């Protein structure tokens, strides 16, 4: 199996390269970039070392068409331009950017501030929230990998929304991410002195992941209303914690709630539900493809609290991309991902 990564000099691309280099079914993994040619990936990431196949190639559609699968770990706009031609040539495409996540091009243009991909390909793209879309992922030619915040938030909300247990207008999401979620490009906001010993809220009511979350919630329950969603940058490298609050329609016990989640995710190899009174921490999924979920119910307020944690570069990006890649190729979804988190 021959695969290529476009955009391997970013954090998600580098993590994807690490996973695919060790994947049992991948014989060759090449790397491409729009701006460099003939430079070894170790120039950007010394930890890669002198790995064969890690020399960057400039984008070339005919060269890319010879691969079995191509991964886009690129900024918005790149896959929207290049992916359609690869799909037309029979190449499986897994896109880690947001270019194909939103079905309505006008919504994409409003939230991303750029031209949307062709409507026909937005329609063909399969949203790769693996645990809730396996059958469609298996048949996908163009796979849109979910964003990091949506992955943590949607996995945390799915059982409640699908079973219609919460008020449709009551969802509040308080999400926090490590600095790698902001990408590798240098900027004042991610300088050490700006983020160290500091917590910052950003993109208040304006994060591009809001319509992605609402789109999926709406497919599960057509009566869903807009959510309140806030994001914070915290001084750590990896990890996302999505703390979710919602008003229940009728009282239930915490044990019943946990049983619902355990039943919902009984076939999910990478979702782990905590026992009553236990809540996950980001360090407990570090470097893994796991999503850990803790639950609480407040009888005084009639609100449920869901705490969902992931590694933003793994389950929130490269790990979930490989999980979807596995299904698209007809393999067990856990191939190349069966390892515990790194701790401490």
UniProtKB/Swiss-Prot annotation:
Q: Which InterPro entries match?
A: AGPR_AS, AGPR_type-1, NAD(P)-bd_dom_sf, NAGSA_dehydrogenase, Semialdehyde_DH_NAD-bd
Record's keyword terms, sorted:
Amino-acid biosynthesis, Arginine biosynthesis, Cytoplasm, NADP, Oxidoreductase
Q: List the disulfide bonds.
A: none
GO function terms (MF aspect): N-acetyl-gamma-glutamyl-phosphate reductase activity; NAD binding; NADP+ binding
> Reaction catalysed by this chain?
N-acetyl-L-glutamate 5-semialdehyde + phosphate + NADP(+) = N-acetyl-L-glutamyl 5-phosphate + NADPH + H(+)
GO aspect biological process, one term: L-arginine biosynthetic process
Q: What GO cellular component is one of the record's annotations? A: cytoplasm
A Pfam family annotated for this UniProt entry? Semialdhyde_dhC_1
Q: What is its EC number?
A: 1.2.1.38
Cellular compartment(s): Cytoplasm
Similarity section: Belongs to the NAGSA dehydrogenase family. Type 1 subfamily.
The entry's protein name is N-acetyl-gamma-glutamyl-phosphate reductase
What organism, scientifically named, is this protein from? Geobacillus thermodenitrificans (strain NG80-2)
Q: What does the record give as the organism's lineage?
A: Bacteria, Bacillati, Bacillota, Bacilli, Bacillales
Q: Its encoding gene is what?
A: argC
């Amino acid at each position: 199996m021959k695969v290529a990564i476009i955009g391997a000099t970013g954090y998600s691309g580098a993590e994807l390269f690490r996973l695919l280099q060790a994947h049992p079914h991948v014989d060759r993994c090449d790397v491409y970039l729009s701006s460099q040619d003939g430079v070894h990936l170790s120039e950007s990431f010394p930890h890669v070392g002198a790995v064969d196949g890690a020399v960057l190639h400039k984008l070339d559609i005919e060269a890319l068409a010879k691969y079995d699968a191509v991964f886009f770990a690129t900024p918005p706009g790149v896959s929207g331009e290049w992916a359609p031609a690869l799909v037309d040539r029979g190449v499986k495409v897994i896109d880690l950017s947001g270019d194909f996540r939103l079905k309505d091009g006008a919504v994409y243009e409003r939230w991303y501030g750029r031209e949307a991909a062709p409507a026909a390909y937005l329609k063909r793209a399969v949203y790769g929230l693996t645990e809730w879309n396996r059958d469609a992922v298996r048949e996908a030619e163009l796979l849109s990998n979910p964003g990091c915040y949506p992955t943590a938030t949607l996995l945390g909300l799915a059982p409640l929304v699908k079973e219609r247990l919460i008020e449709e207008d009551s969802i509040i999401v308080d999400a926090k991410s490590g600095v790698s979620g902001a990408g590798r490009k240098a900027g004042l906001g991610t300088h050490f002195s700006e983020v160290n010993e500091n917590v910052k809220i950003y993109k208040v009511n304006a994060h591009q992941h809001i319509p992605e979350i609402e789109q999926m919630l709406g497919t599960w329950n057509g009566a869903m209303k807009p959510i309140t969603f806030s994001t914070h940058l915290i001084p750590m490298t990896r990890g996302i914690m999505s703390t979710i609050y919602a008003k229940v329609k009728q009282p239930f016990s915490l044990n019943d709630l946990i049983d619902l989640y355990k039943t919902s995710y009984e076939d999910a190899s990478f979702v782990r539900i905590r026992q009553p009174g236990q809540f996950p921490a980001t360090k407990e999924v570090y470097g893994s493809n796991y999503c850990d979920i803790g639950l609480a119910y407040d009888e005084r307020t009639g609100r449920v609290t869901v705490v969902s944690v992931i590694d933003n570069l793994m389950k929130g990006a490269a790990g979930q991309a490989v999980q979807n890649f596995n299904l698209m190729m007809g393999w067990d979804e856990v191939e190349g991902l069966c390892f515990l988190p790194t701790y401490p």
